[in-house]
C-alpha cells in the first residue's frame, strides 16, 4: 500500500466529515470546539490550531484515508492531535503509517526532541499503537479519561522525508 501525507485539499474535508458519524465521535476526535454536525465548508477554519499544521494521508490514487495535526505547545516538544483513520481503512496498518509519517513530518518541521499526544484510556487500539511506537504514559499529565503520552525523538520511528507547510 503506497501511502503519502499531503496538505489538505478542499475535497479531503468531505471525506473527513464522513468519518465522524455523531456528536460523541466528534467530541472524542476534535474536542469541544467543534460541534456536531459541522458544516464541511467550515472544517478548514474550525480545525485551525495556532502554529499547527494539518495533513491528510492518502492512498496512491489520492483517496484520503487518514488525518492528523501537529503543533508546538512547549518549546522542544511537538504535540500530535486529531488523528483519525477512515473506517474503511482501519485494521490495515493505516494508523501506524499515518503516525509514522506524521511524527517524521512534525519533528522535521519543528526540530522537536520529543513528541506528545493524548489518547482516551478506553481506546485500546490507539493506546496499543502509540505504545508500540515508543510512547510512554505520563500519569502526572493524564486524567481519568485520557492518557498523556510522550516519546523522545531518539526512541521514536525514523523521520519521513517530505516538505513542511
Across the structure, where does each feature detected by a protein language model lie?
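Conserved G/P- and acidic residue-centered "switch" motifs that form tight phosphate/ATP-binding loops
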Residues: 93
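Conserved GNAT acetyl-CoA-binding A-motif
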Residues: 106-118
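Conserved beta-strand-loop-alpha-helix junction that forms the acyl-donor binding cleft
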Residues: 87, 116-127, 143-147
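Terminal substrate-recognition subdomain of acyl/acetyltransferases
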Residues: 147-165
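Extreme N-terminal starter segment of soluble prokaryotic enzymes
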Residues: 2-4
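Conserved active-site alpha-helix within GNAT-family acetyltransferase domains
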Residues: 96, 121-139
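Acetyl-CoA-dependent GNAT
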Residues: 7-81, 86-88, 99-109, 140-143, ...
Amino acid at each position: 500500500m503506497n501511502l503519502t501525507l499531503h496538505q489538505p485539499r478542499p475535497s479531503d474535508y468531505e471525506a473527513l466529515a464522513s468519518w465522524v458519524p455523531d456528536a460523541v465521535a466528534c467530541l472524542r476526535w476534535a474536542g469541544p470546539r467543534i460541534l456536531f454536525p459541522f458544516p464541511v465548508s467550515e472544517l478548514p477554519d474550525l480545525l485551525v490550531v495556532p502554529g499547527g499544521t494539518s495533513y491528510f494521508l492518502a492512498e496512491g490514487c489520492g483517496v484520503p484515508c487518514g488525518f492528523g495535526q501537529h503543533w508546538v505547545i512547549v518549546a522542544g516538544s511537538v504535540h500530535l492531535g486529531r488523528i483519525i483513520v477512515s473506517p474503511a481503512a482501519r485494521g490495515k496498518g493505516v494508523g501506524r503509517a499515518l503516525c509514522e509519517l506524521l511524527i517524521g513530518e512534525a519533528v522535521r518541521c519543528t526540530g522537536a526532541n520529543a513528541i506528545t499526544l493524548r489518547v482516551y484510556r478506553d481506546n485500546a487500539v490507539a493506546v496499543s499503537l502509540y505504545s508500540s511506537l515508543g510512547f510512554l504514559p505520563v500519569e502526572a499529565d493524564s486524567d481519568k479519561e485520557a492518557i498523556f503520552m510522550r516519546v523522545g525523538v531518539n526512541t521514536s520511528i525514523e523521520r519521513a522525508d517530505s516538505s513542511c507547510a
